[in-house]
């Protein structure tokens, strides 16, 4: 049985909250606003899992729902680009996990690259 768009939207919102909760401490560290999270590598590995699961929540029809926070016209026209963005997020998060194990300087450098992937997708597809 296929999931209803409303169920997928809830899944998506939960996954995005999870991604944010894992990313925020790393981003704070990279920006010099927080200490290095002791569990930075695990957080980055969690981000990989979320990035691989997240596309499930963006099934066709979910972009037009109230509270979707998605630019429906951009999503509809560029859904392949959107899915490629998730692949890029998984790849950058994998690099982030390796960088976290390599040390603080490597983590900061890779966090900048990971953040660019987040920002590019948000600018293209997320409603203000």
UniProtKB/Swiss-Prot annotation:
Bilayer-spanning residue ranges: none
Q: From what superkingdom does this record's organism come?
A: Bacteria
Keywords linked to the UniProt accession: Electron transport, Heme, Iron, Metal-binding, Transport
Question: Where, by residue number, does heme c bind?
Answer: 13, 17, 69-70, 118, 121-122
Instruction: Identify one Gene Ontology CC term for this UniProt entry.
Output: periplasmic space
GO biological process: one example = electron transport chain
A single GO molecular function term of this UniProt record: electron transfer activity
**What Pfam families would the database entry show?**
Cytochrom_C_2 (PF01322)
Report the PTM annotation.
Binds 1 heme c group covalently per subunit.
- Biological role: Cytochrome c' is the most widely occurring bacterial c-type cytochrome. Cytochromes c' are high-spin proteins and the heme has no sixth ligand. Their exact function is not known.
Write the protein's name: Cytochrome c'
Origin organism lineage: Bacteria, Pseudomonadati, Pseudomonadota, Alphaproteobacteria, Rhodospirillales
């Amino acid at each position: 049985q296929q999931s209803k768009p409303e169920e997928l939207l809830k899944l998506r919102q939960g996954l995005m909250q999870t991604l944010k909760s894992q990313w925020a401490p790393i981003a704070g560290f990279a920006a010099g606003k927080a200490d290095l999270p002791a569990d930075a590598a695990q957080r980055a590995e969690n981000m990989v899992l979320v990035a691989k699961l997240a596309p499930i929540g963006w099934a066709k029809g979910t972009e037009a729902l109230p509270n979707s926070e998605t630019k429906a016209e951009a999503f509809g026209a560029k859904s392949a680009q959107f899915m490629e963005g998730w692949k890029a997020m998984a790849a950058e998060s994998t690099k982030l996990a390796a960088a976290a194990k390599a040390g603080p300087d490597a983590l900061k450098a890779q966090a900048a690259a990971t953040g660019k992937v987040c920002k590019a997708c948000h600018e293209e597809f997320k409603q203000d």
